[in-house]
Amino acid sequence: MKLVTVAATALAMLASEASAQSKSLKDRLLGTWHFVIAEVTAPDGQKSFPFGPKPRGILIFAPEGDFAQIHIAGEVPKIASSNRLAATPEEYAGIMRGTIAQFGTYTVDEDKQTFTMKFTASTFPNWEGTLQTRSVDKLTDEEFINTNPQVGAGRGSAYNLYRRAR
């Protein structure tokens, strides 16, 4: 009986994976994803984690082609005054280093297995109006990994892991 249960479970998992693979890349990206980790690899091979070991965040792909993305480091300084408009320069700097938020539109290239985001607005205003393309390295019903091949200022490439929100 155990063998039958194990075999049935394995077949169900394979069928689920095959069904997911038959959908378009865009259809598989749609929805809400929780940010798990970002790992940047510098040109010299050195790795860093710009949002720390336990970041928080979300990436949303809407069917009409809009996206919203927020990445926050696990440890962002609190503002002592409790007034977001009256932080110290050090508090503002710590917050800026540990967060990024942006929204805009996206397109998907099914053949290349990439998606390109056009930034309408960002907490890093230099990105506004720009395009950034990410490769889709892994995409299942539960997990999504993409790579940004060119992190700003020649810092290398970034690997980003997300888990689907449930």
Would you name each region that the model predicts?
Residues 2-15:
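Bacterial N-terminal signal peptides
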Residues 18-166:
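Lipid interaction determinants
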